[in-house]
Amino acid sequence: MSRLLFLWTVLNPQELEKNLSVFQYVSDEASLNALVAQYQQSPLLVLDTEFVRTRTYYAKLGLIQAYDGKTLALIDPVALPDLSAFWSLLDNPNIIKLVHSCSEDLEVFAHYGQRQPTPLFDSQIAASLCGMGHGLGYAKLVETCLGEVIDKGESRTDWMRRPLTEAQLSYAANDVLYLYQLYPQLADKLKAQDRLGWLYEEGERMTEGRLATPDMDTAYLRVKNAFQLTEHQLAYLKVLAKWRLEKALARDLALGFVIKDHGLIALAKKQPKSMGDLLKLNDLTEQEKRIHGKDILRVMQTADLSNPPELVDVLALKPGYKSAFKNIKTCLSELCEQHAIPMEMLGSKRHIHEYLQWRWDKQQGELPTVLSGWRGQIAAESLAKLDV
């Protein structure tokens, strides 16, 4: 049976009697199904998750918080391994999903639910687009808008341990309770500035591609310092990075707990041919050598040296990079000031690199982010005039 706990917090001071709130600890299927049936009729649903991630590739989901303005639920995924009924809420187009700084939550939804929330309203992005500052934390946003001070003391606790403490439950409930109260303020500000569409566009961008499986053949491109290697060495790195990713997924281990990046780079450079060669490497731990040594030697023998990858392209090393980067950054900085948009939203290093790569590739491929959607409306004309 589900436990009921009473949280004496008012959603709207003018409607005290109507909105005295109950939060429900959901740990059985019947309660979950009843809750989902209610939420399916709600126009707005606040979502948050609590999880643990230490050595694992995937986060370990410890709790799901949800609130529709009527019932605040703390859903126990440890007691409820089958949450398919709940996941069906995520892509219901009639329910706005309200979250805060949700990139890690989206990872959880993708892994456990195989779905992404849509339409998505991220309050951190909303605050940025409203001119309240970039990257505002939840506690700071609540204090700024509602005058409430939130205790964040439970944020690093063990969410997999049972039973959860009253302090953990209260902390988790507050994460969605106050977010529900923030929504009207943020939505009104965005509407007044005609930027609500921008916010939902950002939600679509954040969820795009989240359900795709990791690309094994390009895993080597995500290894730190891969750009240092020759084509011959990259052939070894490619098979090693693919093997490491496969191993990490199979054992649910963070990549660094299989072999760290610098270990892969060392193997690709030194190319051990025997266990004796491998044991001499100082860049691998004794545990890595003992557990993975034979596998490493076997995998390295599969490297396709006749058809190696191309050298990793490093934009910052190209002639003219510094001046081009500076010109683009100056242009975008002026536009950000003109439109009261944080530089991180329009002119981040990633945005500039993506645009510059596109320009130098003679405008091949899909449009860079800074030329797409609302960003393109603001920046496309000015950027086209630059000589880069």
Swiss-Prot record:
<dbReference type="InterPro" id="IPR010997">
    <property type="entry name" value="HRDC-like_sf"/>
</dbReference>
<dbReference type="GO" id="GO:0042780">
    <property type="term" value="P:tRNA 3'-end processing"/>
</dbReference>
<dbReference type="Pfam" id="PF21293">
    <property type="entry name" value="RNAseD_HRDC_C"/>
</dbReference>
<dbReference type="Pfam" id="PF01612">
    <property type="entry name" value="DNA_pol_A_exo1"/>
</dbReference>
<dbReference type="GO" id="GO:0003676">
    <property type="term" value="F:nucleic acid binding"/>
</dbReference>
<dbReference type="GO" id="GO:0005737">
    <property type="term" value="C:cytoplasm"/>
</dbReference>
<dbReference type="InterPro" id="IPR002562">
    <property type="entry name" value="3'-5'_exonuclease_dom"/>
</dbReference>
<dbReference type="InterPro" id="IPR002121">
    <property type="entry name" value="HRDC_dom"/>
</dbReference>
<keyword id="KW-0378">Hydrolase</keyword>
<dbReference type="GO" id="GO:0000166">
    <property type="term" value="F:nucleotide binding"/>
</dbReference>
<keyword id="KW-0269">Exonuclease</keyword>
<dbReference type="GO" id="GO:0008408">
    <property type="term" value="F:3'-5' exonuclease activity"/>
</dbReference>
<comment type="similarity">
    <text>Belongs to the RNase D family.</text>
</comment>
<keyword id="KW-0963">Cytoplasm</keyword>
<dbReference type="InterPro" id="IPR012337">
    <property type="entry name" value="RNaseH-like_sf"/>
</dbReference>
<feature type="domain" description="HRDC">
    <location>
        <begin position="230"/>
        <end position="310"/>
    </location>
</feature>
<comment type="function">
    <text>Exonuclease involved in the 3' processing of various precursor tRNAs. Initiates hydrolysis at the 3'-terminus of an RNA molecule and releases 5'-mononucleotides.</text>
</comment>
<keyword id="KW-0819">tRNA processing</keyword>
<dbReference type="InterPro" id="IPR006292">
    <property type="entry name" value="RNase_D"/>
</dbReference>
<dbReference type="InterPro" id="IPR036397">
    <property type="entry name" value="RNaseH_sf"/>
</dbReference>
<keyword id="KW-0540">Nuclease</keyword>
<dbReference type="InterPro" id="IPR048579">
    <property type="entry name" value="RNAseD_HRDC_C"/>
</dbReference>
<protein>
    <recommendedName>
        <fullName>Ribonuclease D</fullName>
        <ecNumber>3.1.13.5</ecNumber>
    </recommendedName>
</protein>
<dbReference type="GO" id="GO:0033890">
    <property type="term" value="F:ribonuclease D activity"/>
</dbReference>
<dbReference type="InterPro" id="IPR044876">
    <property type="entry name" value="HRDC_dom_sf"/>
</dbReference>
<dbReference type="InterPro" id="IPR051086">
    <property type="entry name" value="RNase_D-like"/>
</dbReference>
<dbReference type="Pfam" id="PF00570">
    <property type="entry name" value="HRDC"/>
</dbReference>
<feature type="domain" description="3'-5' exonuclease">
    <location>
        <begin position="24"/>
        <end position="191"/>
    </location>
</feature>
